[in-house]
Amino acid sequence: MRMLRDNPDNVDVRIYGTNVLRDAPALTACDVAEVEPRHVSDADYAEFALEFCRRHRIDVLIPPRRLVALAGLVDDFAAVGTRLMCSPPAAVEVLTSKSRTYEVAAEAGVPVPPWRVVSDAEGFRDAVRELSATGERICIKPAGEYSAFGFRILDDGPLRIKDLLAPPLPLASVAAVADALRRAADEDEAIPEFLVMPYLDGPEVSVDCLSAPGGATLSAIARSKQGRYRHLLDDPALTAIARRLVGHFQLAYLSNVQLRHRGGEPVLLEANPRASAGIFQTALSGVNLPWAAVRLLVSGDAGPLPAPRLGGRLAVTEIATEVDGGTPLALIERPAPAPDPVRVLAEIDTAPGAAPRARREAELLLGEETAKAG
């Protein structure tokens, strides 16, 4: 959003944003913010988006999600005065499925890793057995558009001390995953398709692309990600893969291609027909991709696109943002601890010689309580 405001044409931009969470931090950067519906059908979401744009007289809609619901409605949005920034519906439909993405990309000559689609325990075990024959570690993830939360590295090895001292990894055993699939089938639980493939553990390369309708790439900026650091890469081989994929799918405006290396060669990890969440990092290259995309959508001209400054290294840091509303975290109420039981001494005997006996009894009791505390 900052890149849109800091545009080279000095256009005063007013930003409207929606999120399913009322207190989403991103909404604090918007001039107008509203809550959007959660868990609704594509048709209902599209109706919400159209009504929002009509009510607020939105000039340009840049959807970061629910693209399948919106991609085929370019004319509907135009009817309410809004230009929709989106790639063709056919491309969006394919790219929201990782398995279909790999199939079509491989046909286009884009290098992809070996993969198998599974949805049951037997197919999963067969896929692991086949793909692990190369000696590579294997992983599993949902085959749909968003897979980060379902990603697991398969590991049947014993836990070692060095594992306990290292940052945690999303590990799961083959047996545990197979049991989960079998249990879901026995309980008639809906099972999505999963992708089984080699685990590519090198630095991820993300290529942010700007392209004209029809898929002609106008700019492609590659950056590697390792921890909190990013490198703006000057590597034509990486951007060439992204250009080929963007051209084959005829992607328009903003898209993102993610690569990793396997055996020293770059292969496709995934592709998204939308801007990446990290596109703001490309600002340090000197190219304002989001604003160029808006210009391209509105006027058909992306404007001057300087050669990106590559080779730089940057760090992604955190900032604290105040948000409105929300419910404070409640302290867990715990019952008051019960008082320790009081031991009552026998009635004090005042007879001669009773004092030493009472002292000995008290010492025994005190010794008993001390032992309990220890």
Annotated model-derived regions:
Residues 1-90, 371-372:
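ATP-binding N-terminal substructure of ATP-dependent carboxylate-amine bond-forming enzymes
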Residues 94-193:
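Active-site nucleotide/adenylate-binding loops and adjacent lid/helix of ATP-dependent enzymes
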Residues 147-148, 223-231, 272-286:
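Glycine-rich phosphate/pyrophosphate-binding beta-alpha loops
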Residues 164-245, 249, 260-261, 265-267:
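Phosphate-binding site of ATP-dependent enzymes
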Residues 236-262, 274-324:
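Active-site "cap" helix and flanking loop/linker of ATP-utilizing ligase/carboxylase catalytic domains
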Residues 262, 292-374:
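Peripheral (often C-terminal) accessory segments that flank ATP-dependent C-N-forming ligase machineries
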